[in-house]
């Protein structure tokens, strides 16, 4: 397979319009998302806070094309995910969307650098920014040869952020990146996330319960009972 370089694309960010996600039928129907509107511009870091069960995880799943909404539109780079076939959606998600999970979700047998190289191998494209430079950008270049078992929780999250940027995503969806981290490391992780969001012009949505780190975000929204409002 021929390896190519990630192509330049026009970034328009993320736009959710009148998105509803319901479960159940009739009187038992529950709205996880209730007519949600959300626009995130390239280079903008949005934090979403709110109680457990408010719909934050459902919002990330819909925005990432992992769950199909009951109604509404989910547009990334002028493409409505709702209109794509499953195969086209999988390809689009790979090329335009990045995910960072609270566990880091790294491959135990691979070094930090090889975590990033694996993405290049899977996609068949060289990263627009070399993996070595991405690790340097998140302060992990000195630990490039270490496997996850020899990294702290904060270090694993840094690698997870770098890995998510390998495919040059237009939209980055981040779920509780500071969970189980102490206060200092929590601030460090969100500072890194904010810097990379601005540096690479990524539209980033971060779900968090950690109010201490909100100062690093461009906007903060609160989700209550499936609805978004300014925090």
Task: Name each region found by the language model.
Residues 172-175:
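Catalytic Walker B motif of ABC-type/P-loop ATPase nucleotide-binding domains
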Residues 147-151, 155-157:
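Conserved ABC ATPase signature
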Residues 30, 81-98:
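ABC ATPase NBD coupling module
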Residues 72-80:
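Conserved ABC transporter NBD signature motif
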């Amino acid at each position: 397979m021929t390896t190519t370089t990630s192509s330049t694309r026009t970034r328009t960010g993320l736009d959710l319009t009148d998105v509803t996600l319901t479960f159940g039928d009739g009187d038992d129907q529950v709205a996880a998302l209730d007519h949600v509107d959300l626009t995130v511009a390239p280079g903008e870091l949005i934090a979403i806070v709110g109680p457990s069960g408010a719909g934050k995880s459902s919002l990330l799943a819909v925005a990432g094309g992992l769950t199909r909404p009951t109604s509404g539109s989910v547009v990334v780079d002028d493409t409505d995910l709702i209109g794509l076939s499953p195969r086209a959606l999988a390809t689009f998600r790979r090329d335009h969307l990045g995910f960072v999970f609270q566990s880091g979700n790294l491959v135990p047998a691979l070094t930090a650098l090889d975590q990033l190289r694996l993405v290049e191998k899977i996609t068949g494209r060289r990263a627009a920014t070399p993996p070595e430079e991405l690790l340097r950008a998140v302060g992990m270049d000195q630990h490039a040869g270490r496997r996850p078992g020899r990294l702290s929780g904060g270090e694993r999250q840094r690698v997870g952020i770098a890995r998510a940027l390998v495919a040059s995503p237009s939209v980055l969806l981040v779920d509780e990146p500071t969970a189980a981290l102490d206060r200092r490391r929590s601030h460090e992780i969100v500072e890194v996330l904010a810097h990379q969001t601005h540096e690479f012009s990524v539209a980033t949505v971060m779900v968090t319960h950690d109010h201490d780190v909100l100062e690093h975000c461009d906007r903060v929204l609160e989700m209550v009972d499936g609805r978004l409002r300014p925090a």
